[in-house]
Amino acid sequence: MSKSENLYSAARELIPGGVNSPVRAFTGVGGTPLFIEKADGAYLYDVDGKAYIDYVGSWGPMVLGHNHPAIRNAVIEAAERGLSFGAPTEMEVKMAELVTNLVPTMDMVRMVNSGTEATMSAIRLARGFTGRDKIIKFEGCYHGHADCLLVKAGSGALTLGQPNSPGVPADFAKHTLTCTYNDLTSVRAAFEQYPQEIACIIVEPVAGNMNCVPPLPEFLPGLRALCDEFGALLIIDEVMTGFRVALAGAQDYYGVVPDLTCLGKIIGGGMPVGAFGGRRDVMDALAPTGPVYQAGTLSGNPIAMAAGFACLNEVAQPGIHETLDELTTRLAEGLLEAAEEANIPLVVNHVGGMFGIFFTDAESVTCYQDVMACDVERFKRFFHLMLEEGVYLAPSAFEAGFMSVAHSEEDINNTIDAARRVFAKL
């Protein structure tokens, strides 16, 4: 047995499913998950000593690549001053100033520890501010594992085939209305049915938890208009897209102004950080200035803030996002060309540093139904054959892939060459 197999066997006796987040168990593709020893740049190294070109990037945070020296040094320096204080620090102020400067729609920001905390807190705030209970989310979109959001969810919930999680009381779920992504008609119908009851829409501006599904041109502006018409708040969940699709996020890329924004992943540079923020009048409703309660023992942790501050300063450097887009476009075009040579029907969606691979005869993939019609079994074979070639993709047909600026042209070319060999075997 390999070291990964031995560790996985031991882990399953101690940790549910052997992992601390379900998708890591390779449930969506079968087989034994890799146990990682270290990572550097665009590469992961497993406990058996094999190197992989990494397109998971810790599920999004590693936009600069693994083990970036600026982030590593910031963490070491912060740790030498103490691990946690439970009191305000100067770095929290500097971090808030940086985030609000980079994302102009955020007048104020509250730091938390994860994307889930960010989304559940933003929804609570929207409900408190509007005095309404119902929310709209979209089928196949995932906004963390808060109870009200595990209704027709994407990401790991979709991978496990349980988009509606057991353990979520019906009384919670009844306030969550689910519409079809990229379909404004379904959203208007929900508002017309409950015109005075909907507090907010929460949406991934690029749906990255049913693989990678960009918005149609009219979709996000249409959501903004409907929220304005019916007095609801628009929450854009940029946990995945923030600082990746563009410096100011997908909201800037697509030209839509939310009331609240949720951030995670890149904002922590690999440390556990989330954030939510937006309009000053809405954020003023948050405790201690307002009645809507939210708190966290480790929120604004000094080490996490130092990592995030270092990461965002690097991400803000000129040329970063152009490089991400060029590398991702090169990969997408190369995969499509290789698939066509092998007569394999393939769609590759990509925006900025995100991409999604779909085995489908369809011309495009624009919604949950399109994703579910794709050939998941073929993806499983593709995943394992690429893994044998030393390419680590997301171990699920329902998860996006992520590029970093640490990936080289050689890495991209090697990935395309590997895919060409794999397509010949499918």
Swiss-Prot record:
One of its GO terms (biological process) is protoporphyrinogen IX biosynthetic process. Pathway: Porphyrin-containing compound metabolism; protoporphyrin-IX biosynthesis; 5-aminolevulinate from L-glutamyl-tRNA(Glu): step 2/2. InterPro entries: 4pyrrol_synth_GluAld_NH2Trfase, Aminotrans_3, Aminotrans_3_PPA_site, PyrdxlP-dep_Trfase, PyrdxlP-dep_Trfase_major, PyrdxlP-dep_Trfase_small. It catalyses: (S)-4-amino-5-oxopentanoate = 5-aminolevulinate. Its EC number is 5.4.3.8. Its main location: cytoplasm. The modification N6-(pyridoxal phosphate)lysine is found at K265. Signal peptide: none annotated. GO terms for molecular function: glutamate-1-semialdehyde 2,1-aminomutase activity; pyridoxal phosphate binding; transaminase activity. GO terms for cellular component: cytoplasm. Keywords: Cytoplasm, Isomerase, Porphyrin biosynthesis, Pyridoxal phosphate. The keyword Kinase does not apply. Its cofactor is pyridoxal 5'-phosphate. It is found in: Cytoplasm. It comes from the Bacteria. Pfam families: Aminotran_3 (PF00202). CDD domains: OAT_like (cd00610). Belongs to the class-III pyridoxal-phosphate-dependent aminotransferase family. HemL subfamily. Homodimer. This is Glutamate-1-semialdehyde 2,1-aminomutase. It comes from Salmonella newport (strain SL254). The gene is hemL.
